[in-house]
């Protein structure tokens, strides 16, 4: 079926999952805010019709839209049933895949979407899955003219588009960026659903697969422009932010590097070096995180250790992860700030013979990262995909957010929906 003849513009798959319910609510909010003429037909998909209806009813109550359940399609679909995945994909132009961990459940969705000419956006933060999908399916997706766009939530839209925003705001050539993520919490603290915890456990437990995948990829190194960016110590002090920091172990570095490769090889852009960190406050927080990290890295090496980590997330994460996830109050009181420190060269400066002579600082700020900012980012990526098709890379394929949306108005959309990009300072040295 041609995509213009399909009954739904987008389908939220995994709508009754912990993150999926918030994505569903965000799609509903977007559609309610739209003018009648611009509203898009959409659906939710999952294994249980009853649970899907409950999610819609909850969103209807929260948004004051009693008729929501009757306005949204419902598709029964099971990740273990390829025929049901095909049937779902045939009914949509775009699937928003919220079913993780993606290393176990992501590939069947990608495969079904490509085979049925349907594009797909996910919120995966697992580098091994993201890079594997590019290696296996980029050419197949391009042949079908569909777009598979990964990591379109908090992992890794703020980082990926934040680097592009910093590049676009610099009056010269940006050559290197360091980002520092700061999570701001209220009195009740931070809590993350254990789905993210499980993805981290499986990812660290199988690091060898990612190394092997990269070793056989035979990709040419991306050239380093200007002074090589020095990596910080595992624990370092950031004077600008008055805080200790540690390396950020999510998907941001993998995603940003893939974006920079794509932009360099396909659009001849000057590549940007990148490093990512997370601030942890004072020395007490550093000690606490060091103990948590040592426990995690020891247990994750062994099968029985991984089982214990999965069974007792609250204990081994020192209370940061739980099977219940955050309360509404915790989410309301939490926000994030991602600060980017960039360096580069003014126009006309010889890069090979000089040190960087421009500094720039930008920020991306937003609400709670996992279940407020992630749905906003995913839904605005979807709206951008559906409305700015002429600005996407030609021909389809498997893309990072930065590669897919570098020429679109996604940053403008995010700014209007509470994920704000801004320049803090810019100066010549």
Swiss-Prot record:
Transmembrane segments: none annotated. The keyword Acetylation applies. One of its GO terms (cellular component) is mitochondrion. Keywords: Acetylation, Oxidoreductase, Phosphoprotein. It holds the Pfam family Sacchrp_dh_NADP. One of its GO terms (molecular function) is oxidoreductase activity. The modification N-acetylalanine is found at residue 2. Its EC number is 1.-.-.-. It comes from the Eukaryota. It is an enzyme of class 1 (oxidoreductase). InterPro entries: NAD(P)-bd_dom_sf, Saccharopine_DH-like_oxidrdct, Sacchrp_dh_NADP-bd. The modification Phosphoserine is found at residues 209, 215, 217. Belongs to the saccharopine dehydrogenase family. PANTHER family: SACCHAROPINE DEHYDROGENASE-LIKE OXIDOREDUCTASE. This is Saccharopine dehydrogenase-like oxidoreductase. It comes from Mus musculus (Mouse). The lineage of its organism: Eukaryota, Metazoa, Chordata, Craniata, Vertebrata.
